[in-house]
Amino acid sequence: MERHIDINQFDYDLPDERIAKFPLAERSASKLLVYRNGAISESRFDRLGEELPEGAMLVFNNTKVIRARIIMHKPSGARIEVFCLEPHAPADYERAFAVKGKCAWSCIVGNLKKWKEGALVIDFTLDGTPQQLRAYRTGTGGREQIVRFEWEADLTFGELLELLGRIPIPPYLNRDSQQIDYTRYQTVYSKFEGSVAAPTAGLHFTPELIASLGAAGVEFEEVTLHVGAGTFLPVKDDDACRHAMHTEHFEIRRTTVERLLHRWGHIVAVGTTSVRTLESLAALAWRIRREGSPDEMRAVGQWELYDIPASYTGREALEELLAYMERNDLGTLKASKQIMIEPLGYRWRI
């Protein structure tokens, strides 16, 4: 089926002075927009419990934003920013952050024209000893560069990023990252490193709000989706359907699939990253039905969700996925997706 979305329908004026450059002192004091029965009203986030349906189970994305921006220099002095997007070798996120000595990442490189060859360096001191991180271009991966990092310090790559990297805040804030961003541009429930942008809907939760919701009977579950830099990419084509969606990696535990089935009809996804993860499960399950395997190494395609028959329900999809994980003794399913959910014509599954 041919699809067309006129991107001009989504144009609107957003004056710079209307963009909050810094968070409120209290996360949950932010405004909450409520849509109910065709009417829009305004509330506060700390009153979220008043708006949730009885028996709700919130699904959080527990990804953690990494200090992905590294400012490096050529021996000539040229300043070049290396923005780490996703691990290349090793490709597994957990291993990529735990590795020592060398690794390779898919990166966006600022001022790339100044980096034709040779190493970029950043000098630092560890326990009084001079150290150095070096970066080499080793190839391209579409719009990104494959960059190999090497170092002698007894640090993991994750520890190096914590020491030398900067937090990547949204470009529309039009400011440099500051100390406050290292704590406030993270959700309070973030656990697993890998994102270059925060799952922003979750930024307004506080431990106190989560505790009060739990006391009121709200349940919680978590998925992990590492948000990619493509979330900031503008749609440049007049037809949004011709915009190539970026790849994002996600994982879900078998116990989570079990609880989704147990709480079917009461699932409330927190933010679009949780939505994208949950909806992608239907495509993986449909692959199992058709091919006998979810083929996790193949990203869920941009329009793959639309190829699933209307008769195939979300509950069936979760049951199919759970049975596959049980047969193969999988505690966690890891996959990736490039899906686009358009405003008209999409049938929600989960």
Language model regions located:
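Surface-exposed, charge/polar-rich loops and edge strands
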Residues: M1-I350
